[in-house]
Amino acid sequence: LLEFIDRGAPAAPSPRPVAGVASAPAAHPAAEPWPGDRVEPWSRIRKLTADHMLMSRRVSAHVQTLFEVDYTQVARIRAGKKQEFAERGVNLTYLAFIAKAVAANLRRHPRLNAAVGADTTILRHEVNLGIAVALDWGLIVPVVKQADELSLLGLARAISDLGERARTKKLNPDEVQRGTFSITNPGVFGSLAGLPILNQPQ
């Protein structure tokens, strides 16, 4: 170090001439329709969903694990409560039980209710459950705010109300914002399991 200080830094070598700048790889070409094909333009929400999901795969590593759950007890409780809920104008679905269990456990295990910052983990104080709703024109995720504070009846009512207003395009902008954890139910399509993409920044 002392020798470097006495003599100074060595002269920088002359830069070598650059033969040429390599061009960036071309983007993957979009598919072109063939004769007889029908072309359906994307709705704005479908385009936004596609862009958001592609961004999510770049931001977060997606790792899935599956568990088998015995629903015998839940099915028994649902059968006993279904009429009572119906008399209050609420359809008691299995999804309400899942939402109740998820909300309680997110409060108990806050790291599951976290978001990824630039170089931080943000542990959310609120437990706001997004409930994915598949529509003919796209996918939307209305949010049940403060879900951990709701009873089973309250959750079932909120899920039913938000789902119906999503299908009739009557949601307010704030009802699809500030979600901390989303639930999707691929079983409605008859599948055994689904591996959804994270809805950032959840």
Regions found by a protein language model. Give the residues of each.
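Intrinsically disordered, low-complexity glycine/proline-rich and charged
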Residues: L1-R16
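C-terminal catalytic/motor cores of large multi-domain enzyme assemblies
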Residues: P13-Q202
